Each structure stands twice: as structure tokens, then as C-alpha cells.
């Protein structure tokens, strides 16, 4: 007698590529942009963080918290400081072909709320956030 096979299942949410759920057309800032201009951009576009790029390559990430800590708290002039002076340089990233499961594990292990998505040439192609994951029913917190 032949053994019955289990149910055939299609791809699950965890098998999705991060490219399918990430935010594309991310608002960025160049390394030489003044912090004052950058903050206006963040407020006008209603975003909490901006990837910092140079010629399309990811160089860092800036959050409102970075601006408060490194500019406001230290009493520095936001018109004289550049994005490169405030950005976090060692940014955790993922590749655009990573699975959602890979990204969820990374976010949980590193306690992150957002991860820039890059291609194999280090070009920024998107940003995946805990909100992007929540939309597909995945809670990272």
C-alpha cells in the first residue's frame, strides 16, 4: 500500500522576498546635505529616518534621534553640520533577495525597526520597516 502524501502547500509569507514588501522609492539624503535641510525634508515627507547615500550607494542612516543626540543636545549648528557628521555609519542591511523570514530574524536579533535594502552592488533599493511587516501580518516586537 502506498503512503499518502501530506497536503501540498504553496509559498508562505516567510518565503516572500523582502523586495515584494519593502518600501521602494525611498527618500534619501546625500552625505554633504546640511542637517537643517535634511530635517525639513524629514518633516515635510513625514519620515522618521533617511538613508544617506553618495552616488546611489548607501553610506549611513539618520534618524530624528540621531539629530537630537548629535546636534540639538550638543548645541551644534544644524546649518553647518552635514548628514555625514550625524549619520550612523555601521548600518545593518539586507539584500533585496533575502526572505521575509531572514529579515524578521535579523530585526529581532538586532532589535531594529528598519533595515535598508541593498542590491549586490551596495546600491540602495528600498527600506523594510516593522510597519511593512505588520501589513503582511508579521509582528516584530
What spans do the regions from the language model cover?
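Tandem CBS (Cystathionine beta-synthase) repeat/Bateman regulatory domains
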Residues: 1-141
Amino acid at each position: 500500500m502506498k503512503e499518502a502524501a501530506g497536503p501540498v502547500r504553496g509559498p508562505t509569507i516567510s518565503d516572500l522576498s523582502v523586495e515584494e514588501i519593502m518600501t521602494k522609492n525611498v527618500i534619501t539624503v546625500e552625505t554633504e546635505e546640511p542637517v537643517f535641510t535634511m530635517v525639513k525634508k524629514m518633516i515635510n515627507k513625514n519620515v522618521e529616518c533617511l538613508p544617506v547615500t553618495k552616488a546611489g550607494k548607501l553610506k549611513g542612516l539618520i534618524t530624528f534621534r540621531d539629530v537630537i543626540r548629535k546636534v540639538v543636545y550638543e548645541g551644534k549648528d544644524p546649518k553647518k553640520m552635514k548628514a555625514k557628521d550625524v549619520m550612523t555609519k555601521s548600518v545593518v542591511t539586507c539584500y533585496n533577495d533575502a526572505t521575509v523570514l531572514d529579515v524578521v530574524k535579523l530585526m529581532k536579533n538586532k532589535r531594529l525597526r528598519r533595515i535598508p535594502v541593498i542590491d549586490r552592488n551596495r546600491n540602495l533599493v528600498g527600506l523594510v520597516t516593522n510597519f511593512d511587516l505588520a501589513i503582511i501580518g508579521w509582528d516584530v516586537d
